[in-house]
């Protein structure tokens, strides 16, 4: 995860807005829960956040977004059983959800090359990950999605990815998004 081209594509680094997000998490009544989710893994040696070295900017940013989701929609992340992530970066969000619910069914749609990076990161963190019938399934073919997705107690995640793809690919996912609970 320390290669320059990976850093440019997948990391928010030591930005000051991350400090604002971290401070919001610290003020949250669930801080002790979020604090556990923030603990960074050693796999890939992610760049640690300079003002909170037990985590990275990415992990703080993801956990902050999840706290906003919980608070805004009044949902419990632990009750989500199925997740479809459109564009999974190196696998950070999937790793966080593995710590939220170890029985989660998680699907990541991405390019094959990025799926390989996700495979390495998640496998090195001890997760059941693969391209066929795993708890963490990696998908790079749109035609295979409907066979693999369970929409009950589910969540569709797309942090930046929907804005980064061609409109025709994005349009393919619009009908899927509305089916998630």
Language-model-detected regions and their locations in the chain:
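Conserved Class I S-adenosyl-L-methionine-dependent methyltransferase catalytic core
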Residues: 1-77
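Conserved class I S-adenosyl-L-methionine
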Residues: 78-89
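Conserved SAM-binding loop of SAM-dependent methyltransferases across substrates and taxa
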Residues: 90-101
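Class I SAM-dependent methyltransferase SAM/SAH-binding core
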Residues: 103-132
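S-adenosyl-L-methionine
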Residues: 121-150
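A short SAM/SAH-binding and catalytic strip from SAM-dependent methyltransferases
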Residues: 154-168
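A short, conserved alpha-helix within the catalytic core of class I
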Residues: 165-177
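Conserved beta-strand signature within the Rossmann-like core of class I S-adenosyl-L-methionine
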Residues: 180-181
